[in-house]
Amino acid sequence: MEEFKRYLELDRSQQHDFIYPLIFQESIYALAHDHGLNRSLLLENEGYDNKSSLLIVKRLITHLITQMYQQNRFIFSANDSNQNHFLGHNTNLYSQIILEGFAVVVEIPFSLRLISSLEGKEIVKSHNLRSIHSIFPFLEDKISHLNYVLDILIPHSIHLEILVQTLRYWVKDASSLHLLRFFLHEYRNWNSLITPNKSSFSFSKRNQRLFLFLYNFHVCEYESIFVFLRNQSSHLRSISSGTFLERIYFYRKIEHFVFVEVFTKDFQTVLWLFKDPFLHYVRYQGKSLLAAKGASLLMNKWKYYFVNFWQCYFSMWSQPRRIHINPLSNHSLDFLGYLSSMRLNPSMVRSQMLENSVLLGNAIKKFDTTVPITPLIGSLSKAKFCNVLGHPLSKPAWADLSDSDIIDRFGCIYRNLSHYHSGSLKKKSLYQIKYILRLSCARTLARKHKSTVRAFLKRLGVELLEEFFTEEEQVFYLTFPKASSPSRGLYRIYRKRVWYLDIICINDLANHS
């Protein structure tokens, strides 16, 4: 980061961010390359090294510098979709590499501005509390006394020019913004980068980082105004408190919410939430929840307020049917790969008064999280691990790998899913997922060696079982290797709800929405 400050020439006011020279630095593309290698949870990054090799990056930078000084640098070839006079051959590949590098470049001034704004302020930073699992203890603690929730799907049909214009207010480097606008319009398949979905906003995996940044930055702009308006109408505005959580830093508690509002403008957030005694808002990517304690009429006003606010002030076309009003008493929230609901836990208390005893019934609201097994099987079916009914299938594409690599891949996928769904109280459905992946692994091995599934399960039974052990099971067997009843111990483990603090993105298979 110190190396980049020399190019940015940032002053203390952080008003003039000159990021254009960074586009021609090879180290930027190395950072983007390392980020891409660590992105996938399903080990689908084969061939990434070939696409982003140092030789290609050097050739691209040299070509860019040469073409920048030519008069006809913005002339396109209408006859060849894979070539133009600016990028030459491999237009799509070069555009992809540049956009990945630009995603790193455009985040630097925001991160530097955030770091400089933290100097001298008593804000605790913790890398262990950046997990998106942190949102569920927040809901468990605050949502039990609320009545209704707005299930909001944020509009996804945004023109990329609007995203660039929003970024223009914070990045004063016109050259970089013109170059970004040029590549967005030059890229032949840019319409496919933003994929409309029936239930959520999604991106293609190519150039995902840049478009997520631009989209989330645009969303945070309207969220900051929404927070301001909410504070103006809050009855406890002077003592309202807030929690600001994003993918890098965690701030425990801030007395004045306007302070949080500044940070949401200064740095891009992926996960963001705030609270007051009557209103709670949570967002992750393209879906948000607004829970409140009030009548359905109030929630209906909030619903149409969001629609008009998006359309009139932020050019985001929306429809009322994308916002659903649901009572928390009998509705499950489908959020971040979990089904969350409020369950009544009845209890009886005997009260003794002199010679008379009275039985008092009491029902306590309890926050319950479960694994949605049907959508999860649907995700496995799309990934060709099973059919739509959940019957395991082989993976012919992996048959060329070694046996150990095949077993490791299947085991890694299950451990990631089990790790992500560790917060569920009822993990019985995970046994079904383990069964599907184990049998799919055995079918793949049998297909490779032209043998039967029964033979491989008999020969690799113990080894195959160990590969599908979760962390909790491994700890149990290491701690109690000679336990008289291991199944009883595992039952106690599976009845516990665990939230991990190292999960910074939703699992690809769990993101079934």
From Swiss-Prot:
Example GO biological process: RNA splicing
Keywords: Chloroplast, mRNA processing, Plastid, RNA-binding, tRNA processing
Entries under Pfam families matching the protein: Intron_maturas2, MatK_N
Disulphide-bridged cysteine pairs: none
Subcellular location, record wording: Plastid, Chloroplast
CC terms in the record's Gene Ontology section: chloroplast
InterPro entries, sorted: Domain_X, Maturase_MatK, Maturase_MatK_N
A molecular function (GO) term: RNA binding
Protein family: Belongs to the intron maturase 2 family. MatK subfamily.
PANTHER family, per database record: MATURASE K (PTHR34811:SF1)
Function: Usually encoded in the trnK tRNA gene intron. Probably assists in splicing its own and other chloroplast group II introns.
Protein's name according to its UniProt entry: Maturase K
Organism: Cyrilla racemiflora (Swamp titi)
Lineage of the species this protein comes from: Eukaryota, Viridiplantae, Streptophyta, Embryophyta, Tracheophyta
